[in-house]
A protein has these predicted regions:
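Cell-envelope/extracellular polymer assembly enzymes that use nucleotide-activated donors
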Residues: 6-8
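Short, well-formed alpha-helical segments that are part of the catalytic scaffolds
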Residues: 16-31
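C-terminal catalytic/acceptor-binding lobe
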Residues: 22, 174-295
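Acidic donor-binding segment of Leloir-type glycosyltransferases
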Residues: 27-63
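Glycine-rich, basic loop-to-helix element that forms the pyrophosphate-binding segment
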Residues: 64-79
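Short aromatic/hydrophobic "clamp" motif used to bind/position activated sugar donors
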Residues: 84
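The conserved acidic donor/metal-binding loop of glycosyltransferases
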Residues: 90-92
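Conserved donor-nucleotide/metal-binding helix-loop-beta segment in metal-dependent transferases, i.e.
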Residues: 95-127
Length: 295
């Protein structure tokens, strides 16, 4: 509980039992569960094996048929909390308990005072697999001063990928809207993004606050007020289905990353972060080492 507000942890899971076990183990190692008032795992395609895993770690298990990432709504609804941290089964904790308490307390205070609407919790530097924000940003912008904490290999980049080029200015000229939408990604590589883009990025303490006009919504690892998540974001998702889907399922990221999101000017917090992204079995992505075509 933070300032009288209940805290909830929700994990969305589909298949990948070994990955889930490693993620839960990372939380258990730091006794993260003691920080939360409620902890729930929501299983897509819920089965007996899933419940056995949850029971083994003393997590409450809920679930149903596979409905994809939109199951985050059901996950949130099952959490008895005012603020919820939503992660996925492949998002292990990589910081200690003290850092977890510090960052989540700070995030709640920023939301309570109206400074931010959502706090991203994917680690700013140890981003894990499948993160292409910096690569895309560097395709349109020359890096001014690389942050000393930046780890190029985390992004599959080398000096060639970060070198300066006049072509980037031309790309921004012919595609100004896309260039603007990429500005928020500067927080993962630039030393002082708030000085480069003061119109869109501010800094308070160790937190960068980015206008949603130039940073995407992400389903992976974030803290948010439960009421705001359900009655604002999920409401929009449910009312605006898209033709573009993933394996036939609606995808919150596809639905929310639209003109509505950009014009709402939500304030997205980016801090050091707590969770990375690593998968060890049952990936649905064809280019993944652990791709499983049967799921």
């Amino acid at each position: 509980m933070i300032n009288g507000k209940k805290m909830g942890l929700g994990i969305l899971s589909y298949k990948a039992p070994e990955t889930l076990k490693k993620t839960i183990a990372s939380l258990e190692q730091q006794k993260a569960g003691s920080f939360f008032d409620d902890s729930v795992i929501y299983f897509n395609d819920f089965c007996d094996r899933d419940k056995e895993i949850a029971d083994a770690f003393s997590y409450r298990a809920v679930g149903g048929p596979n409905i994809g990432f939109t199951a985050q709504q059901q996950l949130a609804e099952h959490l008895d909390a005012d603020y919820i941290v939503l992660i996925q089964n492949d998002c292990p904790l990589i910081e200690n308990f003290s850092e977890l308490k510090k960052q989540l307390t700070m995030a709640v205070e920023l939301i309570e005072t109206g400074r931010i609407d959502l706090m991203r919790l994917r680690h700013q530097w140890h981003v894990g697999e499948g993160f292409c924000d910096v690569e895309k940003y560097a395709g349109f912008y020359n890096i001014c001063v690389v942050n000393e904490a930046f780890i190029a290999k985390e992004h599959g980049l080398d000096e060639e990928g970060l070198k300066h080029s006049w072509v980037k200015s031309f790309k921004r000229y012919i595609r100004p809207l896309k260039a603007r939408r990429l500005i928020g990604r500067s927080v993962y590589v630039e030393k002082s993004p708030e000085k480069l883009f003061p119109k869109y990025i501010q800094k308070t303490g160790d937190v960068l606050i980015v206008d949603s006009e130039c940073i995407d919504y992400t389903e992976q690892s974030f803290l948010i007020q439960k009421d705001f998540f359900l009655n604002t974001l999920c409401k929009f998702i449910n009312e605006n289905p898209k033709k573009r889907t993933l394996h036939g399922f609606q995808v919150p990221e596809i639905i929310l990353n639209c003109l509505w999101w950009r014009k709402k000017h939500f304030k997205i917090g980016v801090c050091k972060g707590l969770f990375t992204h690593n998968r060890f079995d049952d990936s649905f992505r064809k280019n993944h080492l652990f791709y499983n075509k049967k799921i």
